[in-house]
Regions:
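A cross-family phosphate/adenosyl-ligand binding-site feature
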Residues: 1-119, 124-183
Length: 183
C-alpha cells in the first residue's frame, strides 16, 4: 500500500493519532510518524513504532547523525501522502508561513508539491475561531492542503464547541480519497 508520513503535534488529541497510526498500519499502509518535540513529551515515539512497525522520529539532528544523512529530505522523498493529526494552531501557523524549526516542519516543507497533504486541526474552539488561525488554515488550503474538518463536542479544556480532532475513521476516509483507493 502507500507510504504515509504522519505528523503529530502536542495536543490532548494525540491519543487519536496513535489510534490512527495503528488503523492505517492494519490496512497495510507504511506509516512513519514524526512528532514535534512537545508531542514526544506527551507520547513516546516508541509507541508509534510499536503500532506501525516503522521508525518514528522527533529530532532531525539526532536522527541525521545516526543515519548519516539529512533525515528531513529522506522522509520527504519517501512520503506518498502527508497527514498531520493533530495539527495545533502553532503548527498550522508555522506551516502556513513556511517556518521549518523542527524535523516535522522541515520534512513537510521539503515534500514535493505533487504529494497530497491532509491537515487535521485540533484546538480550543476560541483558538480555531481566531482570525489569524482562520487565515492560516485558508492559506494552507490555498496552498493545496486538504482540510479534514474538526468535530464538535466536549473539549479536553472543558468547553463545548468545534475543534475536536476528527475521528480516525473520518481521517482514514480522507486518506482513501487522497490516495484514490477504491473498496
Amino acid at each position: 500500500m502507500s507510504r504515509i508520513l504522519l505528523g503529530a503535534s502536542a495536543s490532548a488529541a494525540l491519543h487519536k493519532a496513535c489510534d490512527l497510526a495503528s488503523k492505517l498500519a492494519q490496512q497495510d499502509h507504511h506509516v512513519r510518524a514524526v512528532l514535534t518535540p512537545r508531542a514526544a513529551e506527551l507520547v513516546s515515539p516508541q509507541l508509534f513504532e510499536a503500532l506501525t512497525g516503522e521508525p518514528a522520529r522527533t529530532d532531525e539532528f539526532d536522527e541525521a547523525e545516526r543515519s548519516g544523512g539529512m533525515d528531513h529530505i529522506s522522509l520527504s522523498q519517501w512520503a506518498e501522502l502527508v497527514v498531520v493529526a493533530p495539527a495545533t494552531a502553532d503548527l498550522v501557523g508555522r506551516l502556513a508561513h513556511g517556518l521549518g524549526g523542527d524535523l516535522l516542519t522541515t520534512a513537510i516543507l521539503a515534500v514535493p508539491q505533487s504529494v497530497p497533504r491532509l491537515l487535521c486541526p485540533a484546538m480550543n474552539p476560541h483558538m480555531l475561531a481566531t482570525p489569524s488561525v482562520a487565515r492560516n488554515l485558508a492559506q494552507l488550503v490555498e496552498d493545496g492542503w486538504r482540510l479534514v474538518e474538526p468535530g464538535e463536542g466536549h473539549m479536553a479544556c472543558g468547553v463545548e464547541g468545534k475543534g475536536r480532532l476528527a475521528e480516525p475513521p473520518q481521517i482514514i476516509e480522507a486518506v482513501r480519497r487522497a490516495l484514490h483507493l477504491e473498496d
